[in-house]
């Protein structure tokens, strides 16, 4: 949400512009992506726990919300009052913002590629706070360079820390004119607050205690490697 708002409401854009000329650039209409949120279509890829949380927040802004998740059962979208589409191309083709909320695996690595990005509605803003390798960084570079999408906000990258030699990162770091204000990067920090760190430690302890007590293993993502899951 923060990346979306920063781009759509011109927060970082106006801050940088006003630093250059606080008087002459005091012009709200300069923001390149300004659009009333309630007039936007917000798309989510992945309707799990985090995707659902994003949906509820987008709806609170009055946005029309659409989802794509081939693994969710029929009617999952109805339980949160949103619409469903049957392909990524369909989602990207009708949304103003697309936010990614899916795990990384063999079927999702480089899922967001040039074929998908080229189907984007004009002016689309892409947000990735899931996992970096889900988006093909070379294809993202091409999509931004060729104006297939308007802007992108990422909290994750295929290589972390960022590879300063990648063409996209190099152009962003150099403030090249074609990408200026169109790419926001944060250091995998979307989750981070003192409260989040406390929750991770507390919940990790809870899971360990429950497992050691013989009451099962919660949230296991590699059960095939657990010799005694109890």
For each predicted feature, which ranges?
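Short, flexible hinge/linker loops that cap or flank conserved catalytic cores
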Residues: 34-38, 59, 118-119, 177
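Residues at the starts of beta-strands that form the adenosine-phosphate
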Residues: 41, 63-64
